């Protein structure tokens, strides 16, 4: 099959040259800067020519940013504005605070031509960094399995780790199934947190973005598809993360 990928780099304030300075023009063409929060001043590299402002999309809903869905809200907007991804075979979600290393995009394309069902990730974290009990993981996965009508096996994430921080690229059908789930169930997920269902808030004050991160990670490792690590660095320490103040699941893992 002919592979057509795009990495959407989600940012509310900046995307610097250093994030993409090692990429060729052909690789840069596989990136789109996706900006949120209209009122926040932006510092965006000119190296990435493609840009989407979420607030200008035909369908847009600021509630997803207001409720701290962040990059997961962008997933919903990519799903509902289908023209944005209709020609793609694979969808990537990145933060602004990454560094694409040399050949990091082309290597993904080369791998996908051999196995288009591969899921690419930046980091797999162990259960000790979940801030959830095994019971709570199982209940979240039961909820997802019912709503998505597909098995999400919490024991896989518990035993082998979970793909974290959203940083990933997946086949479009994998992406769309999760984005559809968020679109249809985000209010109930908020209710799970608000009402401390299954005592899910007892370990730390989880925020929407953190729970969605974990649910995305549980879902991906349950797909029984090949997993391969991206050659992309998460450059967390070079940035101030103001949205992580009053920490929820914005736990900085060492």
Predicted regions and their residues:
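ER/Golgi luminal nucleotide-sugar-dependent glycosyltransferases, focusing on the catalytic module
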Residues: 1-254
């Amino acid at each position: 099959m002919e592979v057509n990928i795009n990495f959407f780099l989600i940012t509310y304030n900046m995307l610097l040259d250093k994030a993409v300075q090692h990429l060729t023009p052909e690789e840069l063409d596989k990136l789109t800067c996706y900006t949120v929060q209209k009122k926040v001043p932006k510092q965006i590299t000119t190296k990435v020519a493609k840009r989407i402002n979420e607030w200008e999309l035909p369908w847009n809903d600021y509630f997803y940013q207001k409720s701290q869905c962040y990059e997961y809200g962008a997933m919903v907007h990519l799903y509902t504005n289908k023209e944005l991804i209709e020609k793609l075979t694979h969808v990537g979600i990145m933060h602004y605070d990454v560094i694409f290393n040399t050949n990091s995009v082309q290597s993904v394309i080369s791998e996908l031509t051999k196995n288009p069902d591969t899921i690419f990730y930046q980091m797999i974290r162990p259960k000790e960094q979940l801030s959830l009990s095994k019971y709570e993981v199982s209940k979240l996965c039961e909820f997802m399995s019912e709503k998505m009508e597909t098995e999400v096996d919490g024991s896989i994430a518990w035993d082998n780790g979970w793909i974290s921080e959203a940083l990933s690229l997946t086949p479009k059908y994998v992406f769309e199934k999760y984005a559809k789930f968020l679109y249809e169930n985000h209010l109930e997920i908020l209710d799970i947190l608000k009402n401390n269902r299954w005592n899910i808030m007892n370990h730390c004050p989880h925020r929407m973005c953190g729970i969605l991160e974990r649910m995305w990670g549980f879902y991906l490792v349950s797909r029984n598809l090949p997993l391969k690590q991206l050659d992309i660095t998460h450059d967390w320490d070079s940035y101030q993360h103001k949205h992580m103040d009053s920490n929820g699941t914005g736990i900085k893992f060492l």
